[in-house]
Amino acid sequence: FTPDLMPNDILGNEILDDSSKNSNFFRFLKGPVFSQLLLADEINRASPRTQSALLQSMQEKKVTVAGKNYDLPSPFHVLATQNPIDQEGTYPLPEAQLDRFLMNIKISYPKLEAEKGILILSNKDLDKEPAKILDFEDLLKYQSIVKSLPVGESIFKYILDIINNSRPETTNIKSIKENVLWGPSPRAS
């Protein structure tokens, strides 16, 4: 993502189709968000308006352009990166928007031995195609099976205990109180 990226650059646009000799009409040209796995690099470099368009599509699983709704493919997942907030040209994501992501992993520099491995791999010819182990129809089927499984009361209690003990204002765990600013929202449950 870049500062000049507009919402329609990721969502899509209506374009004038003049391929017919008798009439012109607008047709929707889908943007990159219409994929099952969207890799969004440096999302906090985009303007808040563009960030909002991406995050709204993540929440609603659809896009609205020119008053028309377009469903996103299923499954739909977003992997995103952010630049550190203290870098110039970044727009911080509000907590309500960060909450749409399942996890936030801070990555530091690798150890020298690991970095050496990265350097060696980056100079190899890696033209071997990775093996396909799952297609999206199977993933949807497995998700449906998991959703249909009965969940016992003890599991709900266990999940809520984990969530409650991850919130600094409701836990007795000292390290959580000292190191966690914002606990998980109900969406995490």
Model features per residue range: what roles?
Residues 12, 120-121:
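Phosphate-coordinating loops and pocket residues in cytosolic domains that bind phosphorylated ligands
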Residues 117:
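Acidic, glycine- and histidine-enriched catalytic cores of nucleic acid- and nucleotide-handling enzymes
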Residues 122-189:
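Basic, amphipathic alpha-helical bundle interface domains used for macromolecular binding and assembly
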Residues 1-6, 102-114, 129-133, 148-151:
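Conserved AAA+ ATPase "SRH/arginine-finger" region at the nucleotide-binding site
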Residues 97, 105-108, 125, 145:
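Interdomain coupling/hinge region of P-loop NTPase helicase/AAA+ cores
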Residues 1-99, 103-105:
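Conserved ASCE/P-loop NTPase catalytic core
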